[in-house]
Amino acid sequence: PQIPADNPMTVEGARLGRHLFFDERLSGDNSQSCSGCHLQESNFAEPTSYSTGIDGITGEINAMILSNLAWQKFFFWNGRAVTLEEQVLEPVINPIEMHETWPDVIEKLEQDAKYVKLFEEAFGENAINQDNAAKALAQFLRTLITGNSKFDQYLEGTYNFTASEQLGFDMYNNEQGDCFHCHGLAATGYQMGAFGLLQFTNNGLDSTYDVGD
């Protein structure tokens, strides 16, 4: 797992992070939490193509899946963040997403006796600040682990694919499906997605050239 030396996993830190993740006060109008887009019933992702923020503005991407982030090396769809502690700060201040400022978030949390206690348990006295909030959120996200899917069981040798599943797996790994070139094989180190992402590649969805060219 990718766990920074200055943010070791603790029960208290993860507990605080869980409270923050589900708290709508992290948004500008107190209406949207992280879990508002990263839906638990959708594996902490969302079943829509684009996310909508507190001001009703639809973004250009959707909320990424949050499971198994402890093994991920890059964050956001374009990989611009290299730690979870860095990543969790941005959605709060993004004007298209939660449209808030961290100083305002901290002020709200300081007025809640529950958070005073949770921060103290996790990080000591007078610990309510942006850095510790980010550390707590990162700790919680690293606890979201899935490792018992059919594919996990297949890799462990405890499950045999059905004929249809085997066909899909074979197609993934051959030139017909052509999935493996970007997402890698089962042995690829986890970087992004259920399989590894070998590199960030233009998928052609936003091509700007004229179809007549």
Could you describe each region identified by the protein language model?
Residues 26, 111, 125-128, 146, ...:
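Alpha-helical structural elements of signaling/regulatory helical domains
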Residues 1-5, 127-159:
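Small beta-barrel nucleic-acid-binding modules, principally OB-folds
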Residues 97, 146, 150, 177-178:
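Intrinsically disordered or highly flexible coil/loop and linker segments, enriched in small
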Residues 45, 94, 112, 147-148:
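Short alpha-helix boundary/capping motifs
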Residues 13, 102, 115, 147, ...:
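N-terminal alpha-helical segment
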Residues 54-142, 213:
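Periplasmic c-type cytochrome electron-transfer domains
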